[in-house]
């Protein structure tokens, strides 16, 4: 049996835990030797900086959550096994769990009873306002990224183009290379003061947080600023990387910041919107921000919602779907309207947008090569994941215990390699006549749409511009494609320069062009191989970067290569093959399905190509799943995040809950001595974040019906009553919510008759068979919720008096969670895993048939 709670309201925020790491280490208060059941430690045990662990190595035996009952610590997912080393286990102890379930205590119930229907409506309306603000800010941020990168790239290509115009190849390369080094190294240096959490795409951190893991520094203001600056600089460095992953992380950080309206980094804790200061609401706002980031980056509001549902979030609801869709719509609208200069006639523009011709359809016989492209996408995607996983593992070992500036040197070396290869590829490629491309060009894709890396200015305004424009032969839509002269004579262009010496979205726009003769087959073959290798070695550098656009570029190049080979024998449109190849390659490394198909269709405006896209995506996922998991699953494992998959590991399904639970538990009584509470909180050997609360002692005589009971004789039982969190106990100590004596008085008639009875009922509550019910709570739900968001001082700085510590008690009954989920000791591992994962628990007490606490399960015990 387990007890559930269907209430969707707030739970207490545990966000201050990481800032209270000094509370227990500095205290020197003498306390009683009386203890509860002290045991081998259970988790969630450490603050998120792992400071307790640094002082006590005895706690490391169970870092992975496995005890001696079931062998070595390892994580097994759907395919393959990942074994954690001792160093990995030590890293895992840094991560705490979030408190998604509601803390349904007496003060919360009292708050609900006195809250009017209007206040409930205002809270719901406030969530919609916050989602609106998330959409607006994410849209503005996407616009700022686009404009900044566009300005830098225009400057870089203009300066290089001046020397290309004069055919000074080496000088042009030095200018191009120097600018790339300047911005690339700067993007890496920005990460040093912020922390490496700001590097990479940030998607593993978003997925981990939404799964219930409190990842240090992953959602704070400093990381947001560092990620944004590094993103802008990195995209101007000439490296093959994309903006989408960082935009998802940035959107998540904006969502968390707007919804909470507080900052632990800045130590700013206003009382505005205190109702949303809990992990559950913050989780929803972060999910909304992640989806809005996708919508703003791709111009795909529906795809953004589906990405949040399918890939990012582990917990979803119908209400969250509507609010997320609203935020994605606002983000896309905000980006578009700013890009157009607030033009009243809106077009389907986006930060990253490609248009395809609506005239040309595929034949059903082409579904066979589309399926084969899906197979190739799955194979190359699995290969990329495997290579990237090994490269990341090598980096973690090679750079361990070495100066961080070596990571900056790595960026310097990679920029040198990338710039040299891409420049030389263009320099040694022969020129082609524009008439060769014009001869078969039927329609080009929509370059009026703005892109993160493209220039929106008039590229033909003077002869020193790098880009030479080829007019569209179609008279229906006066559109233009970018071609690069690159030392070619007038009327000629360099086909490789259009791919290697160009922005990524401009290169994709050329690959999606319906002209069959823009690129030759050897050019596509060489560039597909080069881009795949460079993308593989670039991923994992110490700067903000994403993989979506680079892998789209690899897939589109390969797909167009296949299309042009087939075009030698039958009449086909290579741009469709480029679209299918891009979709297959993205599915091959990310294993996204529904959201990816919708994003690709919204991105290219090619709804008529839905069937080929879905076919290639599904086949690529099936093929990739045969070999390994997605790149993000591997990164989560390598970063030692205690991530709970939707299904339990198959290697552990034969176990029971008794095989994984911690059998000895630190418990507290419903009414506990202040000295005992301080002792438990200060314990370095047993640093816990949740404590089961057991019932008060009961009289020996079960037949006694006196309402006041004879409490001189009693037995100590461990019957489970509820759960109290560490931060709640600290809050009660800080505000001195104490009783002068234990509220279990003798029979009032023996202490002075009716007057004492009335006093005791006023002091301790109504009489029951075993004593007195809890007194009226002295702390409101509003005060506790607001207080839990702040930074409390160490216990020895709370000015607690010795008399208070030695003689007073804390009545935990008004504040403990009365509706916690519990598991019976007969439960299987699979059932326990499902309960824990589905509800998003932090602690799962295990009880026997008598409802006595026999163990406890936390996140790391399930891995």
From Swiss-Prot:
Topological domain spans for side Cytoplasmic: 1-124
What InterPro entries has UniProt attached to this entry? CBS_dom (IPR000644), CBS_dom_sf (IPR046342), Cl-channel/antiporter (IPR051280), Cl-channel_core (IPR014743), ClC (IPR001807)
A GO molecular-function descriptor: chloride channel activity
Compositionally biased residues, Low complexity: 49-71, 439-460
Q: Which domain of life is it from?
A: Eukaryota
Cite the residue spans of the region called Disordered: 48-78, 434-460
Q: Which PROSITE patterns match?
A: CBS (PS51371)
Q: Looking at the UniProt record for this protein, which Gene Ontology cellular component terms does it annotate, in alphabetical order?
A: chloride channel complex; intracellular membrane-bounded organelle
CBS domain span: 661-742, 816-863
Alphabetically sorted, this entry's keywords are:
CBS domain, Chloride, Chloride channel, Ion channel, Ion transport, Membrane, Repeat, Transmembrane, Transmembrane helix, Transport, Voltage-gated channel
Q: How does it sit in the membrane?
A: Multi-pass membrane protein
| Gene3D superfamilies, per database record | CBS-domain (3.10.580.10), Clc chloride channel (1.10.3080.10)
Subcellular location, record wording: Membrane
Q: Which Pfam families match?
A: CBS, Voltage_CLC
- What task does this protein carry out? Voltage-gated chloride channel. Chloride channels may have several functions including the regulation of cell volume, membrane potential stabilization and signal transduction.
| Similarity comment text for this entry | Belongs to the chloride channel (TC 2.A.49) family.
Q: What is this protein called?
A: Chloride channel protein A
Naturally occurring in which organism (per UniProt): Dictyostelium discoideum
Gene behind the chain: clcA
